[in-house]
């Protein structure tokens, strides 16, 4: 996804042919293909359902690069939306499985990613997508804190548990699904997330994000095995990009150089001390207290 997004960025600026040789571009056209992990019937190949968002993004960028028509992206988007409706319905959260009830960080984050990918590729999020995005915002707001700490449960968290907030909140700010006060507080919290990234997650000696234990690469801010040491370079690129592109959105919205709202700490005291968010109801109810 990141590779093809960069190619699209170059293409949009009229620089692609100058930056990438034709033979390299031909190779990338074959390799950067959503079909490598999606079957012809649009089922994923041994991957959790958040990868539908990745597949849609790649298909949409391939279309904008002139590599394929729009039909695959449209079908993958419809598949994602149908998944929401089928397994969460009115509650608006993504089951990571086909109805087995695994709701974690991705369940809240995915709608933010979908909204961003729609906007990045020239599409308009539907009212339904905006409503689901607002539900994710409602879950995140009571979790705001002074230290920029994000999700503490679910798979593949670590620093990604923090950046999940950045992506959902900036999508919500772009689509105006928050109140002006909520938007200011979202910016204040996002600033704390980025400060935590630099002060806690980045190892000052190596200059690398620190996820891999007491090695050359850090002092032990551990995550799960999914993000093993083989992914050191990729995780640094991925995380840096998340902070850079979400900061660029805040800049576009008028927050460039702005000091976070001084009333943030007082505002935290107005938040509910406990909430109940339903993910799905049925034979087995799923929710988050």
Show where each model-derived region lies:
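Aromatic-lined, polymer-binding surfaces characteristic
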Residues: 1-176
């Amino acid at each position: 996804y990141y590779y093809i997004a960069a190619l699209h960025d170059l293409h949009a600026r009229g620089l692609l042919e100058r930056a990438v040789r034709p033979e390299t571009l031909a190779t990338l056209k074959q390799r950067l293909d959503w079909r490598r992990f999606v079957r012809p019937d649009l089922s994923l190949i041994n991957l959790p359902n958040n990868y539908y968002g990745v597949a849609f993004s790649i298909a949409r960028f391939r279309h904008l690069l002139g590599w394929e028509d729009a039909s695959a992206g449209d079908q993958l988007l419809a598949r994602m939306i149908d998944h929401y409706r089928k397994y969460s319905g009115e509650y608006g959260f993504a089951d990571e499985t086909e109805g087995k009830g695994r709701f974690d960080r991705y369940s809240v984050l995915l709608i933010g990613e979908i909204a961003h990918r729609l906007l990045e590729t020239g599409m308009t999020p539907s009212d339904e997508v905006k409503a689901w995005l607002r539900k994710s915002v409602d879950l995140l707001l009571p979790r705001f804190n002074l230290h920029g700490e994000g999700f503490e449960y679910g798979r593949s968290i670590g620093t990604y548990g923090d950046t999940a907030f950045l992506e959902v909140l900036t999508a919500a700010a772009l689509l105006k699904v928050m109140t002006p006060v909520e938007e200011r507080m979202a910016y204040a919290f996002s600033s704390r997330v980025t400060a935590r990234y630099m002060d806690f997650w980045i190892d000052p000696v190596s200059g690398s994000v620190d996820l891999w234990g007491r090695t050359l690469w850090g002092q032990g801010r551990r995550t799960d095995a999914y993000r093993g040491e083989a992914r050191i370079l990729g995780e640094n690129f991925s995380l840096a990009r998340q902070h850079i592109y979400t900061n660029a959105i805040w800049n576009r919205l008028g927050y460039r150089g702005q000091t976070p709202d001084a009333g943030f700490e007082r505002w935290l005291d107005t938040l509910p001390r406990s909430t109940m968010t339903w993910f799905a109801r049925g034979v087995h109810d799923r929710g988050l207290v």
